[in-house]
Amino acid sequence: MAKKPVMLAILDGLGLSDHKDGNAFSLAKKPNLDKIFKEYPHTVLGASGLSVGLPDGQMGNSEVGHLNIGAGRIVYQALTRITKSIEDGDIFKNEALLKAIDNAKNNDSAIHFMGLLSDGGVHSHIDHLKGLIDFAAKSGVKKVYVHAFLDGRDTAPKSALTYIEDLEKHMAEVGVGSIATVSGRYYAMDRDKRWERIELAYNAMVLGKGEVATSPKEAVERSYHDNKTDEFVLPTVIEKDGKPVATIKSNDSVVFFNFRPDRARQITRAINDKEFDGFKRETLNLVFVTMTEYDSTIEGVEVAFKPESYVNTLGEYVSKQGKKQLRIAETEKYAHVTFFFNGGVEEPNQNEDRALIPSPKVATYDLKPEMSAYEVTDEVLKRIDSDEYDMIILNYANPDMVGHTGVIDAAVKAVETVDECLGKVMDKILEKNGALFITADHGNCEQMIDYSTGNPMTAHTTNLVPFAYIANDAKEKELREEGILADIAPTMLQSMGLEVPKEMTGKSLFK
């Protein structure tokens, strides 16, 4: 018997804003989305700050958004957990961090803090780094070094010097710490197996090889002079008296203070995995601490804040009911519809199929704003036609990934591409008498100009995101206001005729 699939299409990075300037969503020709918002029940959802377990006013992101949607409850984020631990002083009792501190003291060796120097709060937070430096100083560690990855994506494109000055001031106040290397996140935080990028960052941190500067400021200013913003600063070794300030050596301790896993895995593997073959590198004997668990298969690392587990996520619960589901996305967002959507669990649920469509190999996605949306659409249409699936979770990466480039014309094209694809998906779901829910995980492409400066804005926003219900019975349904991302899973379960498990604290959006 043909199934009536219930599908969730996540339009990544598509928020709502009344501002027309720099708003790729409102500038785009989008007949299908216009029709949806005119003819079908729709509402708006909170996707940032307290609504998703982040500090008040903190912009949402893809990881957090998918965790909350999949869990059907507010998931308190690593950012909030770590900040609280520092404020409460609990961090001084953290076993993994104590191991790193003790190793440096016992061997009279160095402790290196590596990570994204930013207050973006997506991958890291500068306040966590300051807390770690305070911990090292109070513990009597003298050799304290920072390997700073520069942001410019979750912060303004040319804001690195502000964070460098802030950090250097803090280190001067506590009396320990120097910046040893700087590297744009494009290199140090690649997640697409572009090992040549990771290698440049590795060479700077471990071998002391690469671009050279006498100060972090010099490295950044030189990069700006070459028209490279923070994200693209070439990995640079900071030298003093003609020698590197510090390199990572055997018997040192390393703390990687990024809390978001996806862009932290590759460089962690490059330093730690015995079987690593991405490029030639040293074998080091280190105490290496990751702030959170980046991947349970990474060898030889200590985890400071171990994952919390979530029972009865949407995928797990639907699986327990004997239903079959599909997760589909292109490479850039595949981890989000699988690992993050399942509450940080790598293993698929029973009867959970996955379709990974490769993202195009381009330097930046403004060069191909369509990304792989057409290929994702072709595949999902085939899968819907197979009549196998009760639930389908799909992600279109374009509004977010192209939004991050700051190139507004490309972002408009990205929205138009997704709109075209959505039209085909909508027609197919209605033909099958199924239900299609449309939402986003956070905002981005709807504000691509910093209204205070007029400069391009490449970061996410705190704007509300859309939520719409498309089905043949949609005219009989109404959606309530003041919802959050955690309310989506209970809504979908109601649409599937399933009870909501007690672990889900989200509430259905149907009135």
Swiss-Prot record:
Single GO MF descriptor: phosphoglycerate mutase activity
Catalytic activity line of the entry: (2R)-2-phosphoglycerate = (2R)-3-phosphoglycerate
Cofactor(s), by name: Mn(2+)
Residue positions of the active site: S62 (phosphoserine intermediate)
Catalytic EC class: isomerase
Pfam families assigned: iPGM_N (PF06415), Metalloenzyme (PF01676)
Pathway linked to the protein: Carbohydrate degradation; glycolysis; pyruvate from D-glyceraldehyde 3-phosphate: step 3/5
EC number: 5.4.2.12
Co-factor note (free text): Binds 2 manganese ions per subunit.
This protein's GO CC annotations: cytosol
One BP term from GO: glucose catabolic process
Binding site for substrate: H123, R153, D154, R185, R191, R260, P261, D262, R263, K333
Binding-site residues for Mn(2+) 2, renumbered to this chain: D12, S62, D441, H442
Record: residues binding Mn(2+) 1: D400, H404, H460
Sorted UniProt keywords: Glycolysis, Isomerase, Manganese, Metal-binding
UniProt subunit comment: Monomer.
Function according to Swiss-Prot or TrEMBL: Catalyzes the interconversion of 2-phosphoglycerate and 3-phosphoglycerate.
Family note: Belongs to the BPG-independent phosphoglycerate mutase family.
PANTHER family per record: 2,3-BISPHOSPHOGLYCERATE-INDEPENDENT PHOSPHOGLYCERATE MUTASE
NCBIfam families reported in the protein's UniProt record: pgm_bpd_ind
Name of this protein: 2,3-bisphosphoglycerate-independent phosphoglycerate mutase
Source organism (scientific name): Clostridium novyi (strain NT)
